[in-house]
């Protein structure tokens, strides 16, 4: 009998996939906020066709399992464009055919013009991106969606770092994800979270990941929500 995939199984499978792809790596990295992070997630490395197809499956399954109602996908420029379009293809393969749209950084004054490309933004819209750092692209997306007369339904991301906003020394009280949820009253859905990553490291039998587990746990202790 086939075992049904649970959300936890999905997140652990995604973490393994991201590690194998080199998208998720361990070491010493400096974030934009100036913090020394023991891990790094770079969705820009989902740059092969088969790899993008796989990550789109994770996005699509996570979205469907969330139970969120949606009519259109929106991908903020630039990483969100590829992620939203690939997720739309994956959803169609699962029997859910929806439109997708994205924005340009600069408006066109010829052709179709404007800043929006793709399906008309209408009904309930899910914003798809890789992560939420400062929340800037989400806020810009909210403005575009509402200006089009549509309703933001959720934000779907690959990884929730579960990390307080601020800098290395000036640590905030909430994460960017929490701020988005509170400000707009919509859910932020993640394929995997920092908690899932720690669970993966706890369960791993790879001795080389032992130090990484300690470093990630210490980082969460200092900056985590």
Swiss-Prot record:
Record's keyword annotation contains Magnesium: yes
Residues the record lists as binding 5-phospho-alpha-D-ribose 1-diphosphate: 32, 78-79, 104-105, 108, 110, 129-137
Main enzyme class: transferase
Pfam families: Pribosyltran (PF00156)
Catalyses which reaction(s): orotidine 5'-phosphate + diphosphate = orotate + 5-phospho-alpha-D-ribose 1-diphosphate
List of residues binding orotate: 40-41, 133, 161
Record keyword S-adenosyl-L-methionine present: no
Pathway involvement of the protein, from the record: Pyrimidine metabolism; UMP biosynthesis via de novo pathway; UMP from orotate: step 1/2
Assigned keywords, A-Z: Glycosyltransferase, Magnesium, Pyrimidine biosynthesis, Transferase
One of the GO biological process terms: pyrimidine ribonucleoside biosynthetic process
Transmembrane segments: none
One Gene Ontology term of the molecular function aspect: orotate phosphoribosyltransferase activity
Record note on quaternary structure: Homodimer.
PANTHER family noted in UniProt: OROTATE PHOSPHORIBOSYLTRANSFERASE 1-RELATED
Family (UniProt): Belongs to the purine/pyrimidine phosphoribosyltransferase family. PyrE subfamily.
The protein's name: Orotate phosphoribosyltransferase
């Amino acid at each position: 009998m086939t075992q049904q995939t649970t959300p936890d199984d999905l997140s652990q499978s995604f973490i393994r996939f991201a590690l194998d792809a080199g998208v998720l790596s361990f070491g010493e990295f400096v974030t934009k906020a100036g913090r020394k992070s023991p891990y790094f997630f770079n969705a820009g490395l989902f740059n092969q066709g088969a790899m993008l197809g796989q990550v789109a499956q994770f996005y699509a399954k996570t979205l469907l399992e969330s139970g969120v109602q949606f009519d259109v996908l929106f991908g903020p420029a630039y990483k969100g464009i590829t992620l939203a379009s690939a997720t739309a293809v994956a959803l169609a393969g699962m029997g859910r055919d929806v439109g997708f749209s994205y924005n340009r950084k600069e408006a066109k004054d010829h052709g179709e013009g404007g800043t929006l490309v793709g399906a008309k933004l209408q009904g309930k819209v899910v914003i798809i991106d890789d992560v939420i750092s400062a929340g800037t692209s989400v806020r810009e997306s909210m403005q575009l969606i509402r200006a089009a007369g549509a309703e933001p339904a959720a934000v779907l991301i690959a990884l929730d770092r579960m990390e307080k906003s601020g800098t290395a020394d000036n640590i905030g009280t909430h994460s960017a994800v929490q701020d988005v949820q509170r400000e707009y009253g919509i859910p932020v859905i993640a394929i995997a979270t920092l908690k899932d990553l720690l669970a993966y490291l706890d369960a791993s039998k790879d001795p080389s990941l032992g130090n990484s587990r300690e470093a990630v746990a210490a980082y969460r202790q200092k900056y985590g929500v």
